Amino acid sequence: MSSGIRTDLALESRELNPDIEGVEEQTEERERMTVSRIKITDRTAAKKLDKPIGKYVTLDAPELCNRPLDLFEQMSAALSEELRDMFTGLKDDATVLVVGLGNRSITSDSLGPRVAERIYVTRHVTEYMPDALPGTVRSVCSVAPGVLGVTGIETMEIVRGVKEYAKPDMIIAIDALASRRAARINTTIQLTDTGISPGSGIGNNRKGLNSEVFGVPVIAIGVPLVVHAATITQEVISLIADKTGLHGDEEKLKRLAEQVISENLGQMVVTPKDIDSIVEDMSGIIATGINMALFGKSYEDVRMLIA
């Protein structure tokens, strides 16, 4: 990495290290979004990119910041499509556990819990009233385990307990992420088959939620909702350099800015003032995409289910 500023996005890690071998890339340009697929194939690349071996898909739609409702539908449909591609071998009657990571009381960290409460849960029906269902329906349950500072219990301990009781065939985890670019807030969704570490968005890594730990496939979905203060400063320096044409000391100034901010403000992270509406929008997009993927429903049908 060229900077000490961390990113949770594999796409950004790759942008910083474009020449590393052991990485397969594919970019698909759609009408209003870009779909980037990255596959890290060996340990050397994983170490250099600071990301586990596996698949990473990024949906990027800059227009989302304007909140166009028709683009919400397109993003949900695209997310659903990519999720189904990761449902390899998942049976129609499988049990799926959706885990909403984060702190419901802190808006910028509440994405996971807000998605979890919008999931169309069916496990109780398949368990106790199966005749009430029209044919084969996946058994879906969701949980928002909270955070260590509120519950006093490691998030993964709670999830492990739920997993042992519900016995899911797959886990889908949702969490807020951190980006190196402020412009990615509210415009980007990443999904990966490598799992996630709660708190990774602010560098507060807890025990990981992944297939190695839980013994079942774990898909993680995240949205950048915070950026480091040093990131914004560096972006401003780049903009000034572009406007003035003075690029000579740009990298030196960026490193100095990062050092000054770190010494005086610590690892400060910031989020937009309209984060409430951003989280509301993104949680709806993600929950709808998950429900569409799990139940094979249309966008309109799913929106009625979770309204």
What annotation goes with each model-predicted range?
Residues M1-I53:
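N-terminal amphipathic/basic leader segments beginning at the initiator methionine
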Residues T44-D92:
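An N-terminal, well-structured beta->alpha segment
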Residues T58-P62, T95-I106, C141-G146:
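Short glycine-rich or small-residue beta-strand-to-loop segments that form or flank ligand, phosphate
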Residues L101-D109, G149, A176-R180:
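Gly/Ser/Thr-rich loops at beta-strand to alpha-helix junctions
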Residues N103-R138, S142:
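Glycine-rich phosphate/diphosphate-binding loop of Rossmann-like nucleotide-binding domains
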Residues L133-K163:
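A structural-propensity feature for long, helix-poor, extended segments
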Residues V143-A144, A173-A307:
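A structural signal for small-residue-enriched, beta-sheet-centric alpha/beta enzyme cores
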Residues K163, P168-D169:
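Proline-aspartate-enriched helix->loop->beta-strand connector
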